[in-house]
Amino acid sequence: MVEQRRLASTEWVDIVNEDNEVIAQSSREQMRAQRLRHRATYIVVHDGMGKILVQRRTETKDFLPGMLDATAGGVVQADEQLLESARREAEEELGIAGVPFAEHGLFYFEDQHCRVWGALFSCVSHGPFALQEDEVSEVCWLTPEEITARCDEFTPDSLKALALWMTRNAKNEAALQEKPEETE
């Protein structure tokens, strides 16, 4: 009976190959222990005026406890769609619900801690925020420059996600400015 309860509470994740194709499923615990390649969502929460919502991870997190995160998000569960995962994570971690999410594509990140295919999203929110106590200890607003100045305090994967979001946003803004206006 105890074993059944343990299995029922196990979080299962898709394991993917270098092409982001599902090749297996494993427990989250096994994925972390063996540094298996998986999927995660990264959500840049911003105020629409240049500030990014930054989270401090709790000391009990299984991945980089106590560090700052430039994005909300987390591991995609087995068989879960990416946007569904992003919405779930934003609501669980911060209480963000009912706001539009912009999709910014996929990226790959690998370091000594993880191997992950990231799905990048963003949303505008001004709070109030309801923090998930076992994952997020506090939040604050920082500019990208302030984040860069404190980069050693941040999870490396969230910094990559933020940098990609900034680059992709700059390209979108440039394309909009170059687009000739229609005349009647």
Swiss-Prot record:
Pfam families: NUDIX
Motif (Nudix box): 73-95
MF-aspect GO terms: hydrolase activity, acting on acid anhydrides; metal ion binding
InterPro entries for this protein: NUDIX_hydrolase-like_dom_sf, NUDIX_hydrolase_dom, NUDIX_hydrolase_YfcD_pred
Cofactor section: Mg(2+)
EC numbers on record: 3.6.-.-
Residues the record lists as binding Mg(2+): 89, 93
Disulfide feature: none
Class of this enzyme: hydrolase
Nudix hydrolase domain residues: 36-164
Keyword set includes Hydrolase: yes
Key words of the record: Hydrolase, Magnesium, Metal-binding
Annotated family: Belongs to the Nudix hydrolase family.
Name under which the protein is recorded: Uncharacterized Nudix hydrolase YfcD
Source organism of this protein record: Salmonella typhimurium (strain LT2 / SGSC1412 / ATCC 700720)
